[in-house]
């Protein structure tokens, strides 16, 4: 699996973030570093298709994000920690929606990840009743379960307790995952993971 970005341009109002930006990544974990406002989260959203660049192209292997937007997005998952804007759904319904979208998801694996993050008792609660930390754990459980080629995680350790941080590091560092999945993450601290590279913004 290869992520390739060519000639990417993006700016907010009159503040340019990316000019002719290029990047090529393969399997393994890449750490995006940079000061606040450098564009780390924006780059993850651009790669994940949550926002569109003003110019440039992004590929996953031979799938181009604008030519095949749905196919592209079903090969990646963006874990940003944002609260889902679906107040009428339960936690279980939010999870079921993702399982139905991402073909090949193993429900038993998802349940195991939910158990590891102590989320099984919350399944029938409205998703709006989760704390910010629980929302993050729900997204991370999905991130660790979905059979995607590209995993994008914004500040994965923010809001997590010590046990959850240790578990997440263990799961992200598993050799089978590192061999098959391109993982791009931001972190304001050294992530203490087996990195294949660092990108300074």
Q: Which residues fall in each region the model found?
A:
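A short, flexible loop at the N-terminus of ABC-type nucleotide-binding domains that lies
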Residues: 1-22, 26
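ABC-family nucleotide-binding domains
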Residues: 36, 154, 161
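Helix-to-loop junction immediately C-terminal to a conserved catalytic motif
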Residues: 48
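Conserved ABC transporter NBD signature motif
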Residues: 56-72
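Q-loop/switch helix immediately C-terminal to the Walker
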Residues: 82, 87-103
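Conserved ABC ATPase "signature" region
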Residues: 107-122
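Hydrophobic anchor residue at the start of the ABC signature
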Residues: 140
């Amino acid at each position: 699996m290869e992520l390739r970005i060519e000639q990417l341009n993006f700016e907010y109002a009159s503040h340019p973030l990316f000019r002719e930006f290029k990047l090529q990544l393969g399997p393994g974990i890449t750490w995006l570093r940079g000061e606040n406002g450098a564009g780390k989260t924006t780059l993850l959203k651009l790669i994940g298709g949550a926002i569109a660049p003003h110019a440039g192209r992004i590929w996953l292997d031979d799938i181009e994000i604008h030519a095949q937007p749905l196919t592209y997005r079903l090969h990646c998952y963006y874990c940003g920690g944002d609260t889902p804007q679906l107040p009428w759904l339960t936690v279980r319904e939010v999870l079921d929606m993702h399982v139905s979208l991402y073909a090949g998801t193993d429900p038993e694996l998802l349940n195991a990840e939910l158990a590891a993050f102590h989320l099984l008792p919350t399944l029938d609660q409205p998703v709006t009743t989760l704390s910010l930390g629980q929302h993050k754990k729900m997204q991370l459980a999905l991130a660790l379960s979905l059979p995607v080629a590209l995993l994008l995680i914004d500040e994965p350790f923010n809001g997590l307790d010590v046990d959850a941080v240790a578990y997440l590091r263990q799961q992200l560092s598993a050799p089978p995952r590192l061999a098959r999945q391109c993982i791009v993450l931001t972190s304001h601290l050294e992530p203490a993971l087996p990195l294949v590279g660092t990108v300074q913004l």
